[in-house]
């Protein structure tokens, strides 16, 4: 089923253009109706939050108006993280939650992300149902009046409740750890001081002064250079970086080396496995995780399961087969025993607890994962699906895989949003990986119509 408005993580686009207040109003009406029609309450309850982007309040007001127009009781959380909304929906037993954010994307973008009453992101089927209402020739949704209209109130206590929940996910005092924490000028910025003071970490805040225009700007999990520099200059034990809506976490060791989501999953998974808490001794990853992580997991008696790219698919696999740890190289990491989606601050606390209790440095803990050099080439093609089924391209991939003899891998997949074929290779050396990916890319350009 092809969706027009919803991507892999909600409705997203350039604010006030692709994602206009008018569209936000309609998404509020349609989404609110679909998610609350079976509610037993006279007025179904929906929590609404946003990140720190300048367009957030504009879109929030439009979305809330749409929710009110179908009779919903709206609780505005203010600026709270995406995983904070997911947690509070369950804690407050609300019918749904909405987060207005474009996550790690640049400031001109924004998005609308729904959560069901169970705290999980919506299924493709529910998103399709909402889209059918958005594209209907006539608006057939209810138009209540008088006491049938929705109401709105602020619920700022939600942030405190979420902070308290996070603190309870670890059992170790973090006293003695010196940590630089980059808030990406995003939704975690107002949480960092209270949270990390309460767990007794010696922390140095970085990029925690949002002004509406600086969210993710040369900071946070996608731009860690400032964090790497600050960790070394302050002689900190490690650094932590979040993204704009707080659902990602990456780390930096005491020498300024990046510790990505793969390594964090390995470190936390190994600790959970040692304590008998890693269900089925398995970590769920996407196909983009590095071969070095799989080898490290295997060498320590752990298993892995791969899904397609997108944290929602990781969560689906975890729920389907009873796993409790999974995530992406980008830093979306799901601890399903605690929350229903990737949670940056939760991940940071779990990682810091492992560092503290192990008595080892982050660099030592991450050393088991020897990252294989990786190279990605994008090829523009006319037909992505036909390209994947091209026999000459399949033969070229098979030849390279034969050369690799298990010590490397090739991943060829279509882009989800652009007319591109993505060719990725991993191998023990940069020279080998470049040779492998070039060999396949050359064949793709020769045999695929319109390839360049």
UniProtKB/Swiss-Prot annotation:
Binds 1 Mg(2+) ion per subunit. Keywords: Isomerase, Magnesium, Metal-binding, Phosphoprotein. InterPro entries: A-D-PHexomutase_a/b/a-I, A-D-PHexomutase_a/b/a-I/II/III, A-D-PHexomutase_a/b/a-II, A-D-PHexomutase_a/b/a-III, A-D-PHexomutase_C, A-D-PHexomutase_C_sf, A-D-PHexomutase_CS, Alpha-D-phosphohexomutase_SF. Its EC number is 5.4.2.10. Activated by phosphorylation. The modification Phosphoserine is found at residue 103. Its cofactor is Mg(2+). The active site is at residue 103. One of its GO terms (cellular component) is cytosol. GO terms for biological process: carbohydrate metabolic process; peptidoglycan biosynthetic process; UDP-N-acetylglucosamine biosynthetic process. It is an enzyme of class 5 (isomerase). It comes from the Bacteria. SUPFAM superfamilies: Phosphoglucomutase, C-terminal domain, Phosphoglucomutase, first 3 domains. It catalyses: alpha-D-glucosamine 1-phosphate = D-glucosamine 6-phosphate. Signal peptide: none annotated. PANTHER family: PHOSPHOGLUCOMUTASE (ALPHA-D-GLUCOSE-1,6-BISPHOSPHATE-DEPENDENT), PHOSPHOHEXOSE MUTASE. This is Phosphoglucosamine mutase.
